[in-house]
UniProtKB/Swiss-Prot annotation:
Protein name per its UniProtKB record: NADH-quinone oxidoreductase subunit I
EC number of this enzyme: 7.1.1.-
Record-listed [4Fe-4S] cluster 1 binding positions: 60, 63, 66, 109
Cofactor(s) required, per the database record: [4Fe-4S] cluster
PANTHER family per the UniProt record, alphabetical: NADH DEHYDROGENASE [UBIQUINONE] IRON-SULFUR PROTEIN 8, MITOCHONDRIAL, NADH DEHYDROGENASE UBIQUINONE IRON-SULFUR PROTEIN 8, MITOCHONDRIAL
Binding site for [4Fe-4S] cluster 2: 70, 99, 102, 105
Species assigned in the record: Escherichia coli (strain K12)
Job description of the protein: NDH-1 shuttles electrons from NADH, via FMN and iron-sulfur (Fe-S) centers, to quinones in the respiratory chain. The immediate electron acceptor for the enzyme in this species is believed to be ubiquinone. Couples the redox reaction to proton translocation (for every two electrons transferred, four hydrogen ions are translocated across the cytoplasmic membrane), and thus conserves the redox energy in a proton gradient.
Chief place where the protein resides: membrane
Residue ranges annotated for the 4Fe-4S ferredoxin-type domain, each copy included: 50-80, 90-119
Membership in a protein family: Belongs to the complex I 23 kDa subunit family.
Catalytic activity: a quinone + NADH + 5 H(+)(in) = a quinol + NAD(+) + 4 H(+)(out)
Quaternary structure note: NDH-1 is composed of 13 different subunits. Subunits NuoA, H, J, K, L, M, N constitute the membrane sector of the complex.
Subcellular location: Cell inner membrane
Length: 180
């Protein structure tokens, strides 16, 4: 071993001790999770929920766009129809063990029924418990868009009421009045 190799080795040791000394008194990045809350960015994508419109009905019209947009195929649903012609999902199932929380299902949904919330505490001991049914996904409120009602915007009539007479429904727009 030459003197040059000895000095290089000593220099690397001094540099390592110096770096450790600098980082020893720096603020720690590790958070003690259950005791300290975790900072979540404003657009954090967590648990998927199904929302309701302002009238209290479920927003999902079972158009199947969310299942088609899902890159891993973790969403499955079956369409059914009420007496007044509205579509709804007979069953709606999401397998969270396969979901990558990409948000493509939320973007594809025309009724804003499917939304990603900042909830991330979904740990289970069995994989079968990560398959959520419609009853597990439905929340009581409208979610991020409290005033949006798909059927009011679409103009579909409700059985027994004329267009524009339903609760939270706007009067129909006369398209001829919009012409220049």
């Amino acid at each position: 071993m030459t003197l040059k190799e000895l000095l290089v080795g000593f220099g690397t040791q001094v540099r390592s001790i110096w770096m450790i000394g600098l980082h020893a008194f720096a603020k720690r990045e590790t958070r003690m999770y259950p005791e300290e809350p975790v900072y979540l960015p404003p657009r954090y994508r967590g648990r998927i929920v199904l929302t309701r419109d302002p009238d209290g009905e479920e927003r999902c019209v079972a158009c199947n766009l969310c299942a088609v947009a899902c890159p891993v195929g973790c969403i499955s649903l079956q369409k059914a129809e009420t007496k007044d012609g509205r579509w709804y999902p007979e069953f709606f199932r999401i397998n969270f063990s396969r979901c990558i929380f990409c948000g493509l299902c939320e973007e594809a949904c025309p009724t804003t029924a499917i939304q990603l919330t900042p909830d991330f505490e979904m740990g289970e001991y069995k994989r079968q418990d990560l398959v959520y049914e419609k009853e597990d996904l439905l929340i009581s409120g409208p979610g991020k868009y409290p005033e949006y009602n798909f059927y009011r915007m679409a103009g579909m009539a409700i059985d027994g009421k004329d267009k524009g007479e339903a609760e939270n429904e706007a009067k129909p727009i006369d398209v001829k009045s919009l012409l220049p």
